[in-house]
């Protein structure tokens, strides 16, 4: 279990790399963050396109990404830091989000005082930081990109047409979008990102609002069908 024994996971990766000549490692979830933070346990010649620990820290958390997006002028929903339930000023509905969490865990839609009261205990149950983000009605989508130390190599945007677990996209429709390309390129250049980067957005009319960042590759099949082979680009 990588969550319970992260160092053991890193050591096992190192052992596998010494035994077999792997051409590439392709992180598809939070193991990308772990590999960036645990490089001391891994071979120096790690076959992976991966950003540094400091770069991950600017994007991996929901709060850090919101701060970085504000700094760059990227469009996001209104958001606030949460000290306690009484400190929230946003109008209903909004999303209460732990700094680190997924759509199925530590993310709650708050539409009333009753909703907030039901999750208030979670705000003090741990040292986790929280934020609230205004709910926006629109089409959920993602823009995926690959960077080589800040240089954009490939990009693909899509919107959800079918829902999966936790509201994720089980089916996607590729779209042409100059704006999402410009936005993700601006972010990648600023961070000097290396590897895959994915931004989640809500499309409302012709505007895109970025709600969080996945500093990794997400499902690549739709992009492949649209002519963008992210795994191949990462390997090469």
Regions flagged by a language model, labelled:
Residues 111-191, 202-210:
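Phosphate-binding site of ATP-dependent enzymes
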Residues 1-3, 45-48, 95:
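Active-site regions of enzymes building and remodeling cell-envelope glycoconjugates
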Residues 19-60, 73-80:
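A short, GP-enriched loop/loop-strand-helix hinge that lies immediately N-terminal to
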Residues 35-38, 105-107, 142, 222:
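Short glycine-/acidic-enriched loop or helix-start segments at secondary-structure transitions
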